């Protein structure tokens, strides 16, 4: 680990290199400096002064281009309202730095690492620059290992890779937020890890809702912030493209500290990775670069790779990333999602149909995929159980049209048995969540992978054919299902 990435003490602004604004085009501005005092690419420069109304101005920008004639072009991280030509610009001499460490837990930050939750300043003793290189090959952990989440449907059918990247697909209201909060809760309890949530181009309302729900479910503990399990970094939809383009790096930098220094397993959520690309496209156009395919920036692959390659497992710890992916116009060949897919190890697809049936988490067992589901990685027992579950559910899906038209009685004996087992499997894939206890009234359940495999093997083998299907709904392991069946039998007697 390169300790030089992290610096003690809050970053201070140097004022030795002072320039003046020569041009402002929306969120992009040009500044002229004296010869020999030019800031470097990616340096943070700060515009200080007063607007015509006499209000103080403090706008941080990031240098993107050196134009010649001692001029630089920079992208603003906040609104440029009130800036005028001739205003002084101060070179900080370094890239943007943000606070890292335990002080970030339970707090909400903007792209600059400033708290925006009105809970007072952050006493950051350690800061880190947001532009860092990916870990060297010698530091990487090459072992393929599963990241156990305690969520049955994920661990069995689309397991996450430790240090991998997972795409989360789902529309509004199907349970993305609840699934995210349960993962944050489980990594803290089972792995002793923490989470960082990067809201990239989020709706402000959604960001606020997430924060309120996290407080309600005790993922964020307002009374004792040090007991919180997550740090939040928001760059909302209404902010300039520069802020939306860099907020993902701010969140990643905070996650890297927990991995490299605290040697923890970290979950990094990015919602939405498409907005990161979209912001980069806006900045690229403002900087005058020639657009590439479908109007995207020519540096799309480089920008995505720069972010994704930093998300990995090292010998010290891991960052496992779950990224919500918006697919524009449902076109999977669009350059933005297509570039994202190249980096993903697994996909978790949420289904509105399952949510409508009341099966939560509403993860689609047939559409969700994982590169980890190979017999030489997960073992023959896990692989064969998962394939058996998928085969049974696929057959049930094929028979649904016949059932709808002719009814169950017209099916063969074998098909009726398949349907009965598939309905049990479908219900057993549901699970009560810790963070949803306030809604369901049922205590949350963490189910180990071994218990998950055992349960589905028993359903597939026919051992539990005599149990009613409602016994499998919203339970943890298979023992709870058999106990629930006994209770149902007593109540109906």
UniProtKB/Swiss-Prot annotation:
It is found in: Plastid, Chloroplast thylakoid membrane. Keywords: ATP synthesis, ATP-binding, CF(1), Chloroplast, Hydrogen ion transport, Ion transport, Membrane, Nucleotide-binding, Plastid, Thylakoid, Translocase, Transport. One of its GO terms (cellular component) is proton-transporting ATP synthase complex. Its EC number is 7.1.2.2. It is a peripheral membrane protein. One of its GO terms (molecular function) is ATP binding. Its main location: plastid. GO terms for biological process: proton motive force-driven mitochondrial ATP synthesis. It is an enzyme of class 7 (translocase). InterPro entries: AAA+_ATPase, ATP-synt_VA_C, ATP_synth_F1_bsu, ATPase_a/bsu_AS, ATPase_alpha/beta_chains, ATPase_F1/V1/A1_a/bsu_N, ATPase_F1/V1/A1_a/bsu_N_sf, ATPase_F1/V1/A1_a/bsu_nucl-bd. PROSITE patterns: ATPASE_ALPHA_BETA. Pfam families: ATP-synt_ab, ATP-synt_ab_N, ATP-synt_VA_C. It catalyses: ATP + H2O + 4 H(+)(in) = ADP + phosphate + 5 H(+)(out). ATP binds at residues 170-177. Transmembrane segments: none annotated. PANTHER family: ATP SYNTHASE, ATP SYNTHASE SUBUNIT BETA, MITOCHONDRIAL. F-type ATPases have 2 components, CF(1) - the catalytic core - and CF(0) - the membrane proton channel. CF(1) has five subunits: alpha(3), beta(3), gamma(1), delta(1), epsilon(1). CF(0) has four main subunits: a(1), b(1), b'(1) and c(9-12). Produces ATP from ADP in the presence of a proton gradient across the membrane. The catalytic sites are hosted primarily by the beta subunits. Belongs to the ATPase alpha/beta chains family. This is ATP synthase subunit beta, chloroplastic. The lineage of its organism: Eukaryota, Viridiplantae, Streptophyta, Zygnematophyceae, Zygnematophycidae. The gene is atpB.
